[in-house]
From Swiss-Prot:
InterPro entries documented for this protein: Ribosomal_eL30 (IPR000231), Ribosomal_eL30-like (IPR039109), Ribosomal_eL30-like_sf (IPR029064), Ribosomal_eL30_CS (IPR022991), Ribosomal_eL8/eL30/eS12/Gad45 (IPR004038)
GO biological process, one term: translation
Keyword Ribosomal protein listed: yes
Gene: rpl30e
GO MF annotation list: RNA binding; structural constituent of ribosome
Name by which UniProt lists this protein: Large ribosomal subunit protein eL30
Annotated organism of origin: Thermococcus sibiricus (strain DSM 12597 / MM 739)
Entry superkingdom: Archaea
Organism ancestry: Archaea, Methanobacteriati, Methanobacteriota, Thermococci, Thermococcales
Matches recorded under SUPFAM superfamilies: L30e-like
Recorded GO CC terms: cytosolic large ribosomal subunit
Record keywords, A-Z: Ribonucleoprotein, Ribosomal protein
Pfam family, one: Ribosomal_L7Ae
HAMAP family for this protein: Ribosomal_eL30 (MF_00481)
Family the entry assigns: Belongs to the eukaryotic ribosomal protein eL30 family.
Amino acid sequence: MDLAFELRKAIETGKVVIGSNETMRLARTGEAKLIIMAKNAPKEVKDDINYYAGLSSIPVYEFEGTSVELGTLLGKPFVIALMAIVEPGESKILSLAGGK
């Protein structure tokens, strides 16, 4: 699977939330279907997101690149440490975590 292609497709056809605060809120409420986290996200953020995602049974995918690389991959001029897939749209992004 081409990660960049599927992420862009999810952004265009589905509902994707970018940012630590909003992603954390979705993890707490169980509204996200997949959380994507940059490998260099701060440790406390990683710990919190893994805890809340675990409580809500939301899969967490650790992106192999940095937050700068994740931002660039999405065509954004800023860093992205956390993002949540709420609706995948026409993408197959949920297959990252064995989703449907």
